[in-house]
Amino acid sequence: IIKVAGKQSWLSEVLRTPEDWQLLREARCPVWLLNASRQPIDKVIAAVSTLDESPEHSTLGDRVIVQAEALAASLKVPLQVVAVIPDWNASRAAMAYVPPIPAQTVYLGDIGAQALQESRERLVAILERLDIDAEKAEVRTGTLTLEIIDAVGDQGLLVIGSAAHRGLAGKFIGNSSEKVLHHLKADMLVVH
């Protein structure tokens, strides 16, 4: 499905589920949402999660990367595979109580560095399994929406997966693709 992305106010999104979100949740095929500008695509960004290791998310991540690689090859533009993990030093989690571990001192900075390293290793392993150059991997720390939007820029094409939360979870939690869509200025392909 190819559709021009609609823009709505934040209040409108709270009061009623936007049509684009409904389409992303219900479609059984990939959905390509076009931005209003007609600028040529200069790169393809595959956004995947390295934090959720469930079989469903792993399969979805593989589909996202394979689809993004095919698009980058056909458009003759670079491919970049991006994962985002929370910034432990800047998040509210950094102020949370960390229970002591016997005979060990725990530093949140160390936890963040370890999470970043593990995320990089997972992403490289995924790319190697899919026979894609590991140099295309990038793990960012920060807020998912802001980091993805920064990676894509104004002329990129974002390829992202949607596991489609439904019901109250969909209303209050939402999906990463929906959160990014609200702020993205570039095209987005959502893979299910």
Question: Predicted regions span which residues?
Answer:
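Glycine-rich, Arg-bearing micro-motifs that act as flexible, cationic patches
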Residues: K3-Q22, I41, L157-H183
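Short, surface-exposed alpha-helical segments at coil->helix boundaries
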Residues: I65, A113-V124
